[in-house]
Amino acid sequence: MMRVPWNDMVYIKRALDIGVMGVVVPYVQNAAEAEAAVAACRFPTEGVRGVAPHAARCSGWGSRIAAYRAAMPQELLVACQIETEEAIDNIEEIAAVDGVDMLFLGPSDISASIGHMLDMKEP
């Protein structure tokens, strides 16, 4: 797994192209952002991930692209990082997005977003 710097299709593609089988996408606030993260992980027509199999380690430099593409929906893990009060308010909708496999809570960032920075005893 790799935590990408931002919910951006270029960062996600780079991580997947080097062969990681899971991404942690930071600062996901709502279902639309979770859907964008999942779409960045999927090839067309299920998503928007770019296709360059001969230039990517993940597909054996093109030699395993069919097998790789077939396995990705089942084997790739997509984790959305929940870090704000807004994300907490939308957590059920984020979790319900098809293709989101895991939610990762950032307790320090959540605490800061509700005005209790570094006070882990508060909600």
Locations of the language-model features?
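Expand to "…catalyze enediolate/carbanion chemistry for C-C bond making/breaking, isomerization
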Residues: 1-123
